[in-house]
């Protein structure tokens, strides 16, 4: 119990970015971090959801902000996160949560939809890492949590696009862990089941 208390005390006053923070798992993580005294910025595509979550976060006595963008748009990601970091400060914690899912047979799924899933679930986190992690390297400290899925551990019928994107995210995370650990940056992958 003492170890858990020490970890929680170490979170107080830190800054976190949660992508896909307007609903679901991202919202839950953002609120949990805020409850531990972490200042939390969130991103997503629905401004009304983001505004509502920011109000909930701020009600916990911490600072919060949001930015509306699509993680598949590299220019939006870099411009929005540069502005957020100028206003909010460099992030100590990155939760790469934004993602989408659609299911269908590999021969039936439309190529554009297949590509969109991979762009959102793999390129999106990559763009966010490229925008945020240099600040962690500069500070020689940080935590990156990439949200993958059990579908990234084992493929199944009708999950080719989703599984490919989540397998890729696990591989990216593992490589990042080896690359960044010398700068005191921890990289973790979570693999939840269906949410």
Feature roles, as predicted:
Residues 105-106, 113-118:
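Substrate-binding pocket helix/loop in short-chain dehydrogenase/reductase
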Residues 134, 178-179:
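Alpha-helical segment proximal to the catalytic Tyr-Lys
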Residues 107, 154-160:
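Active-site loop immediately N-terminal to the catalytic Tyr-X3-Lys motif
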Residues 22-24:
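Conserved glycine-rich cofactor-binding loop
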Residues 47-48, 68-80, 111:
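The beta1-alpha1 cofactor-binding region of Rossmann-like NAD(H)/NADP(H)-dependent oxidoreductases
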